[in-house]
């Protein structure tokens, strides 16, 4: 089944926007708190949300920091604001045909690479959403990779722990490399609350790559 790509006007959770913008959640909160991102592209109702199309502007702001001053970056975002506001009802295919060049005196900034990058990562987010399912009949409603009983967050924890794809495929033969990649994206976009899973939390039947244990010294005296 082909994944449905989020629309330009869809409001993404802050954690999803961080994935699409390829920045940290802290950076997303910063562009909201410091009004770097225009208020028209932000919603604070029922949590923080960001316009999907505006993720391109977040990516631009941070990726261009070494080459452009904050004033130049903010100027470009303000110019792009009107264009994006007018184009927010368009599909992404049409948005990518728009002119995203910003001119200011001797400075020319091309925002198209950031638009294209955000579009590609939104495709990944849509695909990640598509492979995840949850049912009370499967592991008590734990999110799993569709068609399997493999918990999504266990796969993501294994990726974060540095396990190789080959080892993970041995542990979960019902997966493939693409599903592992998308499971990691889903978990990053929808982080669990509380303590993160750690190395020893791999599910029953999975393969542990290494297990170093250090004996505690007994206290003397």
Swiss-Prot record:
Organism the protein comes from: Sinorhizobium fredii (strain NBRC 101917 / NGR234)
Record SUPFAM superfamilies: Homeodomain-like
Gene3D superfamilies noted in UniProt: Winged helix-like DNA-binding domain superfamily/Winged helix DNA-binding domain
UniProt xrefs under InterPro entries: DUF433, Homeodomain-like_sf, WH-like_DNA-bd_sf
Disulfide bonds: none
One Pfam family hit: DUF433
Alphabetical UniProt keywords: Plasmid
Highest taxon in the source lineage: Bacteria
Name of this chain's protein: Uncharacterized protein y4eO
Cross-referenced PANTHER family: SSL5025 PROTEIN, SSR2962 PROTEIN
């Amino acid at each position: 089944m082909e994944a449905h790509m989020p629309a330009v006007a869809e409001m993404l959770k802050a954690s999803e926007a961080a994935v699409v913008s390829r920045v940290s959640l802290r950076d997303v909160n910063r562009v909201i708190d410091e009004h770097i991102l225009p208020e028209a592209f932000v919603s604070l109702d029922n949590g923080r949300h960001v316009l999907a199309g505006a993720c391109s502007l977040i990516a631009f702001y941070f990726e261009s920091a070494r080459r452009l001053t904050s004033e130049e970056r903010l100027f470009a975002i303000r110019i792009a604001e009107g264009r994006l506001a007018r184009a927010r009802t368009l599909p992404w295919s049409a948005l990518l045909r728009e002119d995203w060049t910003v001119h200011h005196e001797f400075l020319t900034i091309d925002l198209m690479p950031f638009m294209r990058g955000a579009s590609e990562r939104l495709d990944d987010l849509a695909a990640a959403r598509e492979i995840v399912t949850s049912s009370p009949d499967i592991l008590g409603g734990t999110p799993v990779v569709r068609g399997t009983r493999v918990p999504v967050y266990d796969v993501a924890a294994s990726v974060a722990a540095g396990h190789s794809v080959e080892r993970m495929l041995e542990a979960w033969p019902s997966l493939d490399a693409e599903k592992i990649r998308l499971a990691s994206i889903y978990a990053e976009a929808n982080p669990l609350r509380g303590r993160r899973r750690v190395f020893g939390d791999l599910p029953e039947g999975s393969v542990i790559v290494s297990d170093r244990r250090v004996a505690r010294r007994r206290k003397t005296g």
